[in-house]
């Protein structure tokens, strides 16, 4: 049950909030009590609060007394309806001062003892409530009726015994020195006329407390101590509240005054307000479960719980928005954040157990750094990439490729001498870069020494793994490039071999069996040369590769290259046949060399026979290429090869064991028909040359007398031509040379005056040149006229 209104007297310095149930009749904790403390602002007061609890018989006026002392509003019994249980379980109210510098007060009203409604279970609840009140309170009020003093049950003797035993249990587990529980005995319906207050005090102290102390069994360390060593005891006599309300109010003020003078400035249990509910809940839960109530352990548990709560809240707040950090500002930002977080944490956690708060504080800083692991990796990613690129550059420089010349060079040397050390160099560079990264990462070690001393090293393994991956990727690019060059070397060796094959195909004595035996031997020799020259190179480029692997690879590549070359040959088969025919038909051997055939010296029969033989010999190539030969492939286990290996697919793909694809009959027929036409054209050309050689006489066969007659008859014409040529080609150049020589010499000797001598000479030379040119034209015209008249003269 909860009242809806807060109670405040205008003359009072405090505000009392409506009570809220802490534990119900079944001893179950009410979570609403925590919300009640939160909403009231109680969790912000720190240690500036006190706790007051009350114990006493049912219907003894406990709630009324608390209402009178603290201006509270606990529910009280309606006597007009008879005596019955009013307060069930444990209820709590909060008294807040209007002056925030004054301590607040938590007031607990517990269910009365000796309850008929509880029946046989009342003793269990009495023990629980007593232990709970003693564990929490700065002061425990024991409410007694004056008329019941001396009675065993009515005087709460059993309750007091429980209180002493429970307090002894608490003190025995508490390590704090001078730990005393304050007990306020409020004797109700007392009057000076009944008994002096001193007598009542002595009675309570001797007949109750000391008597109980002597009865109970105590730990050895308390055997020689009195009850006063554990309790601070005050006894108050309270007048009847109904018949003497003014005196009752006066007596209550005396109790309140004493409380104000005795209450500690801060909560004596050293539990801060924000952890009070958790502490209270754990204490009650431990009591209910009938476990040993260890107050230091409870405080440590509370400290651990609250510090963890503070840690979680601060950690979440600090990592909500983390900016993108570069390598240069990462450490500065992190140290600034650690200082801020540590200061914020200890501003709240310092109220709890120092050992626990420091331990959780270190956990906070460690977890905060852990939250920055992705940020750390991101900030250092650029440096890792830089190392990877640098390693690639160093390796590329170490194995510089120069293919501009006729021969491939790697690091200015033959590749076969350099490639064997490739993988070893890769490992050395990778190890060097990894060490370089480790040295660089050591600068990011966190050393923190403020309230707590703390060191943290970020996990460098992800960055190292990333570096290894990047470096391996960069190296694989270079490795693939060099493996490609190695493949080119294999292809080049095969192509060089095939030049010899093509020359062999032009041999006139070519036969099927001899050619394929020759090619088989040549192929084996080429494969052996590849193994001898390139095995160590391959093993250097592909780390831990076996000799058998390269033997298989080189065999596969050579077979593919052979098939490719034979395919190219078949694509150009017509041209090759024409070359064979041309060689056999148009050329003949002379002193060990091929020379063109002199067709004009050949007879028609010889030409026909030569054509027939050359054609047959040329087409022999088709018979050779209609056959092929197989190469026995050794067994090879592909499981021994890594799947990311450059040549994995090459080694895994099915390869034909045949050197070539045989020429089909249809293709051979088509090529034969096409070539026959061109053979015929070459034959006809030879016939033309032969016929021309027999019909046209050579100039060497003309008799010498013919040349003598020609000279005599044409002498006049020859003389005229020579005369013209002599004058035109000799005199004119001499005039030009004379003019320029005279002009140059005169200018050198006479300077500006030379012009008066040069000009007349120039004019004279020009006039002579004009006259000679005119004579040359007239002479040519005259010769042309004579020639024309000679042609028109009738024959006699």
From Swiss-Prot:
Pfam families: RHD3_GTPase (PF05879), Sey1_3HB (PF20428)
Compartments, as annotated in UniProt: Endoplasmic reticulum membrane
First-level EC class: hydrolase
Keywords: Coiled coil, Endoplasmic reticulum, GTP-binding, Hydrolase, Membrane, Nucleotide-binding, Transmembrane, Transmembrane helix
Stretches assigned to the GB1/RHD3-type G domain: 46-280
Span of the signal peptide: none
Gene3D superfamilies named in the record: P-loop containing nucleotide triphosphate hydrolases
Cystine crosslinks: none
Hydrolase is among the record's keywords: yes
KW Cytoplasm (keyword) present: no
GO biological process: endoplasmic reticulum membrane fusion
InterPro entries xrefs: G_GB1_RHD3_dom (IPR030386), P-loop_NTPase (IPR027417), RHD3/Sey1 (IPR008803), Sey1/RHD3-like_3HB (IPR046758)
Family: Belongs to the TRAFAC class dynamin-like GTPase superfamily. GB1/RHD3 GTPase family. RHD3 subfamily.
Function per UniProt: Probable GTP-binding protein that may be involved in cell development.
Protein name: Protein SEY1 homolog
Organism name: Theileria parva
């Amino acid at each position: 049950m909860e009242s809806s209104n807060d109670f405040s007297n205008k003359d009072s310095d405090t505000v009392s909030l409506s009570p809220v149930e802490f534990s119900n009749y079944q001893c179950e904790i009410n979570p609403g009590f925590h919300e009640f403390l939160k909403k009231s602002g109680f969790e912000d007061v720190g240690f500036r609060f006190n706790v007051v609890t009350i114990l006493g018989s049912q219907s003894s006026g406990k709630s009324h007394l608390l209402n009178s002392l603290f201006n509270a509003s606990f529910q009280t019994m309606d006597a007009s309806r008879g005596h019955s249980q009013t307060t069930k379980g444990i209820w709590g109210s909060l008294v807040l001062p209007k002056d925030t510098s004054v301590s607040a007060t938590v007031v607990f009203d517990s269910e009365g003892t000796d309850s008929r409604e509880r029946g046989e279970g009342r003793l269990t609840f009495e023990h629980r409530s007593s232990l709970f009140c003693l564990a929490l309170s700065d002061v425990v009020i024991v409410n007694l009726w004056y008329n019941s003093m001396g009675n065993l049950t009515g005087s709460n003797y059993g309750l007091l015994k429980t209180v002493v035993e429970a307090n002894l249990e608490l003190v025995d587990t508490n390590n704090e020195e001078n730990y005393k529980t304050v007990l306020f005995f409020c004797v109700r319906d007392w009057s000076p006329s009944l008994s002096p207050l001193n007598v009542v005090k002595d009675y309570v102290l001797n007949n109750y407390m000391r008597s109980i102390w002597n009865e109970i069994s105590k730990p050895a360390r308390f055997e020689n101590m009195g009850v006063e060593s554990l309790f601070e005891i005050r006894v108050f006599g309270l007048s009847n509240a109904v018949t003497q309300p003014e005196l009752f109010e006066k007596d209550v003020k005396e109790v309140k005054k004493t409380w104000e003078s005795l209450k500690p400035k801060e909560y004596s249990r050293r539990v801060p307000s924000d952890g009070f509910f958790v502490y209270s809940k754990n204490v009650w839960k431990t009591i209910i479960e009938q476990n040993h109530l260890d107050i230091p352990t409870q405080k440590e548990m509370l400290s651990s719980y609250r510090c963890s709560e503070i840690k979680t809240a601060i950690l979440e707040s600090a990592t909500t928005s983390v900016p993108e950090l570069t390598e240069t500002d990462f450490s500065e930002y992190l140290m600034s954040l650690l200082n801020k977080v540590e200061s914020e944490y200890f501003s709240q956690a310092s109220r709890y157990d120092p050992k626990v708060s420091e331990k959780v504080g270190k956990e906070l800083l460690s977890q905060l750094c852990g939250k920055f692991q992705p940020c750390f990796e991101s900030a250092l990613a650029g440096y890792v990439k830089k190392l990877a690129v640098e390693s690639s550059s160093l390796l590329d420089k170490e194995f510089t490729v120069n293919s501009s010349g006729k021969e491939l060079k790697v690091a200015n040397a033959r590749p076969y001498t350099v490639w064997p050390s490739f993988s070893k160099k890769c490992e050395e560079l990778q190890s060097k870069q990894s060490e370089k990264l480790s040295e660089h990462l050591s600068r990011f070690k966190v050393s923190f020494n403020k309230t707590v001393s703390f060191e943290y090293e970020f996990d460098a393994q992800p960055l190292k793994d990333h570096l290894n991956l990047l470096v391996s990727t960069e190296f694989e690019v270079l490795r693939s490039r060099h493996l490609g060059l190695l493949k080119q070397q294999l292809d080049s060796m095969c192509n060089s071999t095939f030049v010899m094959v093509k020359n062999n195909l032009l041999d006139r004595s070519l036969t099927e069996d001899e050619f394929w035996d020759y090619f088989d031997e040549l192929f084996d020799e080429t494969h052996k040369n590849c193994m001898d020259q390139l095995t160590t190179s391959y093993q250097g480029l592909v780390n831990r590769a076996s000799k058998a692997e390269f033997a298989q690879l080189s065999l596969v590549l050579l077979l593919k290259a052979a098939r490719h070359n034979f395919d190219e040959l078949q694509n150009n088969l017509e041209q090759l046949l024409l070359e064979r025919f041309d060689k056999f038909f148009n050329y003949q051997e002379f002193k060990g060399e091929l020379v063109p055939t002199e067709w004009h010296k050949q007879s028609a029969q010889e030409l026909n026979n030569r054509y027939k033989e050359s054609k047959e010999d040329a087409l022999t190539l088709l018979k050779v290429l209609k056959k092929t030969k197989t190469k026995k492939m050794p067994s090879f286990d592909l499981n021994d090869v890594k799947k990311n290996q450059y040549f994995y697919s090459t080694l895994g793909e099915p390869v034909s064991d045949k050197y070539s694809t045989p020429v089909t009959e249809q293709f051979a027929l088509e090529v034969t028909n096409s070539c026959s036409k061109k053979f015929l054209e070459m034959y006809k050309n030879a016939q033309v040359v032969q016929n021309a050689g027999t019909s046209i006489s050579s100039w060497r066969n003309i008799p010498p007398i013919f040349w003598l007659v020609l000279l005599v008859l044409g002498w006049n014409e020859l003389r005229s031509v020579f005369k013209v040529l002599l004058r035109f080609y000799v005199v004119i150049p001499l005039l030009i040379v004379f003019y320029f020589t005279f002009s140059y010499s005169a200018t050198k000797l006479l300077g500006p005056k030379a012009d008066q001598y040069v000009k007349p000479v120039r004019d004279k030379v020009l006039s002579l040149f004009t006259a000679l040119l005119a004579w040359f034209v007239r002479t040519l015209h005259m010769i042309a006229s004579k020639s024309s008249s000679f042609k028109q003269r009738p024959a006699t």
